[in-house]
Amino acid sequence: MTGIAAASFFSNTCRFGGCGLHFPTLADLIEHIEDNHIDTDPRVLEKQELQQPTYVALSYINRFMTDAARREQESLKKKIQPKLSLTLSSSVSRGNVSTPPRHSSGSLTPPVTPPITPSSSFRSSTPTGSEYDEEEVDYEESDSDESWTTESAISSEAILSSMCMNGGEEKPFACPVPGCKKRYKNVNGIKYHAKNGHRTQIRVRKPFKCRCGKSYKTAQGLRHHTINFHPPVSAEIIRKMQQ
């Protein structure tokens, strides 16, 4: 092996015929060389042996990646893939997904998802949504802006409910916000879009309203407000006021 050939292995760069491809590991480089630059045809090997009877490269005899090793590697990849999918799904349900870079938007129409209302089972923990049932329309129109707040992210439940389970779908993760046609290939893309794409568009109802006009998203918030700003008046104070 020449010095240049040896150096190519240390740099993980293929030097065969000016190929120049770079690989992350030595194993990947060797596999590339065996697949693309070394002949495995028995007739070619026999011809080379006849031409050079005193020397035959070991690469033709002892392959680094044998057929058995390749089959084992493919089998291992198939076993790892379902576990990776389960890990991603679990990460979405917990909402623990790191912020990824932005992705380009898709052109497919997102599936129709049911409207997210204050009566949803996850309203108290992750309130989201921008559309409500028809029977609430009259109340919404007469309500003031004080009864609304903005939400900076879409819940994991909403993302999972809009996920396309078709295995052939290139971008299965669709934005659940009605009218948004954004689709993404992975969980990180849709989570980043959900966190930043509709920061000022999503309005969430604050259904717990005080007689003074203030509204709150939870009963605990309304109770805290009442205790601090509208404390109960004792019977003794009422009698003194009537005197």
Swiss-Prot record:
<feature type="compositionally biased region" description="Low complexity">
    <location>
        <begin position="118"/>
        <end position="130"/>
    </location>
</feature>
<feature type="compositionally biased region" description="Acidic residues">
    <location>
        <begin position="131"/>
        <end position="148"/>
    </location>
</feature>
<keyword id="KW-0863">Zinc-finger</keyword>
<feature type="modified residue" description="Phosphothreonine">
    <location>
        <position position="109"/>
    </location>
</feature>
<feature type="region of interest" description="Required for interaction with NR2C2">
    <location>
        <begin position="39"/>
        <end position="79"/>
    </location>
</feature>
<keyword id="KW-0862">Zinc</keyword>
<feature type="zinc finger region" description="C2H2-type 1">
    <location>
        <begin position="12"/>
        <end position="37"/>
    </location>
</feature>
<feature type="zinc finger region" description="C2H2-type 2">
    <location>
        <begin position="173"/>
        <end position="198"/>
    </location>
</feature>
<dbReference type="GO" id="GO:0005829">
    <property type="term" value="C:cytosol"/>
</dbReference>
<dbReference type="GO" id="GO:0005634">
    <property type="term" value="C:nucleus"/>
</dbReference>
<dbReference type="GO" id="GO:0006629">
    <property type="term" value="P:lipid metabolic process"/>
</dbReference>
<dbReference type="GO" id="GO:0003714">
    <property type="term" value="F:transcription corepressor activity"/>
</dbReference>
<dbReference type="GO" id="GO:0001650">
    <property type="term" value="C:fibrillar center"/>
</dbReference>
<dbReference type="GO" id="GO:0017053">
    <property type="term" value="C:transcription repressor complex"/>
</dbReference>
<feature type="compositionally biased region" description="Polar residues">
    <location>
        <begin position="89"/>
        <end position="108"/>
    </location>
</feature>
<keyword id="KW-0805">Transcription regulation</keyword>
<keyword id="KW-0597">Phosphoprotein</keyword>
<comment type="function">
    <text>Acts as a transcriptional corepressor of orphan nuclear receptor NR2C2. Inhibits expression of the gluconeogenesis enzyme PCK2 through inhibition of NR2C2 activity. Also involved in transcriptional activation of NAMPT by promoting expression of PPARA and PPARD. Plays a role in lipid metabolism by suppressing lipogenesis, increasing lipolysis and decreasing lipid accumulation in adipose tissue. Plays a role in glucose homeostasis by improving glucose metabolism and insulin sensitivity.</text>
</comment>
<protein>
    <recommendedName>
        <fullName>Juxtaposed with another zinc finger protein 1</fullName>
    </recommendedName>
</protein>
<dbReference type="GO" id="GO:0005654">
    <property type="term" value="C:nucleoplasm"/>
</dbReference>
<keyword id="KW-0479">Metal-binding</keyword>
<feature type="region of interest" description="Disordered">
    <location>
        <begin position="89"/>
        <end position="151"/>
    </location>
</feature>
<dbReference type="InterPro" id="IPR051580">
    <property type="entry name" value="ZnF-Chromatin_assoc"/>
</dbReference>
<feature type="zinc finger region" description="C2H2-type 3; degenerate">
    <location>
        <begin position="208"/>
        <end position="230"/>
    </location>
</feature>
<comment type="subunit">
    <text>Interacts with NR2C2 (via ligand-binding region).</text>
</comment>
<feature type="site" description="Breakpoint for translocation to form JAZF1-SUZ12 oncogene">
    <location>
        <begin position="129"/>
        <end position="130"/>
    </location>
</feature>
<dbReference type="GO" id="GO:0000122">
    <property type="term" value="P:negative regulation of transcription by RNA polymerase II"/>
</dbReference>
<keyword id="KW-0656">Proto-oncogene</keyword>
<keyword id="KW-0677">Repeat</keyword>
<keyword id="KW-0443">Lipid metabolism</keyword>
<feature type="modified residue" description="Phosphothreonine">
    <location>
        <position position="113"/>
    </location>
</feature>
<keyword id="KW-0160">Chromosomal rearrangement</keyword>
<dbReference type="InterPro" id="IPR013087">
    <property type="entry name" value="Znf_C2H2_type"/>
</dbReference>
<dbReference type="GO" id="GO:0008270">
    <property type="term" value="F:zinc ion binding"/>
</dbReference>
<dbReference type="InterPro" id="IPR036236">
    <property type="entry name" value="Znf_C2H2_sf"/>
</dbReference>
<keyword id="KW-0804">Transcription</keyword>
<keyword id="KW-0539">Nucleus</keyword>
